[in-house]
From Swiss-Prot:
PANTHER family with a match to the protein in the record: ZINC FINGER PROTEIN, ZINC FINGER PROTEIN 771
Annotated SUPFAM superfamilies: beta-beta-alpha zinc fingers (SSF57667)
One Gene Ontology cellular component: nucleus
Organism: Rattus norvegicus
Name of the protein in question: Zinc finger protein 467
Domain of life per record: Eukaryota
Amino acid sequence: MRETLEALNSLGFSVGQPEMAPQSEPRDGFSNPQEKMSSRDESTLHSCSGPETPGQKEGIHTEQAEAPCMGSQACIPQKAEPASSVPGEEWMIRKVKVEDEDQEAEEEVEWPQHLSFLPSPFPTPDLGQLAVAYKLEPGTPGTLGGIALSGWAPIPEKPYGCEECERRFRDQLTLRLHQRLHRGEGPCACPDCGRSFTQRAHMLLHQRSHRGERPFPCSECDKRFSKKAHLTRHLRTHTGERPYPCAECGKRFSQKIHLGSHQKTHTGERPFPCTECEKRFRKKTHLIRHQRIHTGERPYQCTQCTRSFTHKQHLVRHQRVHDAASRTRSSPDIPATPHPPTASLAPSPTGPKPFACSHCGQSFGWKKNLATHQSLHLTEGRPFGCDECALGTNVDPAAEPSACTPHAPDCGPGSGPVAPQRTTSSERSFFCPDCGRGFAHGQHLARHRRVHTGERPFACAQCGRRFGSRPNLVAHSRAHSGARPFACAQCGRRFSRKSHLGRHQAVHTGSRPHACAVCARCFSSKTNLVRHQAIHTGSRPFSCPQCAKSFSRKTHLVRHQRIHGEAALPASASNLSAPAWSNPSEVVPPPIFF
């Protein structure tokens, strides 16, 4: 109180000295705390200066008090000074300390209740505005602290910040509870998984995940949630509410965390680096997902087969294959595809292909592959149509009869209708400047150009052999591990590459989709077609280093070298000139367009 009065005196208010209540004053005198002490009534005060007894001090009391003087000498009458001359004198109240005579119990009189009915604890206009602006509380010791009000600053909304993660809090208790997370000192541990929490309420909310308790249902759909905040966030998907706008581009988001991640695209911030390589990521989840490439972890496994995946969305997409298969088995009335031989050209090694083309009946395991395939049926940019397969082409059949050769009649026994060869589509807007080949995506063109530049950025960790694409490296690594994940459904034979399986299945189906443009002979694989075309072109790229004799096939060269006393191809054979079509999967356009 003394500090409060001194601060008010420094502001120019005339405030009297604080008066001490007598220690022996009974409690009954303060039975009504709402009595107002009027400073206009003068009363005679007596000063007791007698010898002090233990626990007694010199005090001042009024004549109206029922208790006698504590001193043995005569009391000296004195005039009582006004308690306050401030216009709002009703607000000023003395904080009285009451003691029992035996000094066994002590208590302090709290602020009188009538103060809550006053319009403002600071009646003067200037002080009242300062009290509102600086959030000063009346009666709190050290509220002003003897410092001029001009030296006080407004209290920030969250003044306490964490040094570890830069989060801010309104009070120190919440800050200390939060800092336990960084130190791993959670006092409340989950008995099921051992996870620690700073507060018991958070631990109880977490235990709902173990019990499967979801007490908050969505009124729009059948989903349920364990927290009300999660339900509120989910409801925005139905209402379309996006309350968090980006200040840079105006894009709006339904969650604040999504806005924070989006803003990093403007700042270029990537705070999460990979410890194995030099890549950096905007989200920690992206870093964790990327690190599975280095560790080989595949945490998402299909419950119906043995396949596993690195991403959850890949597992969900894969499970649609099983769902479509179960629907097909449960619905026998589903009509068959119009062209069974075409649809069975490349069956999936892991299950059915639920996405069928409505034009030709060819089936696909993924919907995006079906969309890419259906672009072949577009007539825009293909003015010349084929009478057999209804596919368009850019070449006039009258000028070039072999423009649509897959339907040649002399394709061998059992060939039947074959899959049409894919020609350049109007949607292939990326063309190679070296060979003119077109691609639908820029990344496919960049991958193709490595054939011309000779770039091979992917190296095998076992033997050091390098490859131009990651799929080729993955397929090569199966040669070291012995993995053969692609099995034939007819004979059970297994293969390390899907293309090898498709080529093998042509043996069972009798399909020969690759026809020679010169003699109309058909082949089951494009490799055999390219090898056959060397007969018409006269190409003999494999030459013997000892007699200069050349051959069209490498196996013929190896067999010839046995004449010279060599049982196998010598080590120097690696320096032989390789044929232009030695790797047909890279040089010759593949029959399937991605």
